[in-house]
């Protein structure tokens, strides 16, 4: 990826990076492990973002 990227693209990439986290432990505990996986998790190599 280019070093000099448009600011809007940088914001989108940062938002995607923040969203790409695991389910918090307190949520797993609160739901008695009914919610463990996070359906919108994205692997950087398998699924690419729309840019």
Swiss-Prot record:
Belongs to the eukaryotic ribosomal protein eL39 family. GO terms for biological process: translation. The keyword Ribosomal protein applies. Pfam families: Ribosomal_L39. Part of the 50S ribosomal subunit. Signal peptide: none annotated. GO terms for cellular component: cytosolic large ribosomal subunit. Keywords: Ribonucleoprotein, Ribosomal protein. This is Large ribosomal subunit protein eL39. The keyword Ribonucleoprotein applies. It comes from Thermococcus kodakarensis (strain ATCC BAA-918 / JCM 12380 / KOD1) (Pyrococcus kodakaraensis (strain KOD1)). GO terms for molecular function: structural constituent of ribosome.
């Amino acid at each position: 990826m280019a070093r000099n990227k448009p600011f809007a693209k940088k914001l989108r990439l940062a938002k995607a990076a923040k969203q790409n986290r695991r389910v918090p432990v307190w949520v797993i505990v609160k739901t008695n492990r009914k919610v463990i996986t996070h359906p919108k998790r994205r692997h950087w190599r398998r699924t690419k973002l729309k840019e």
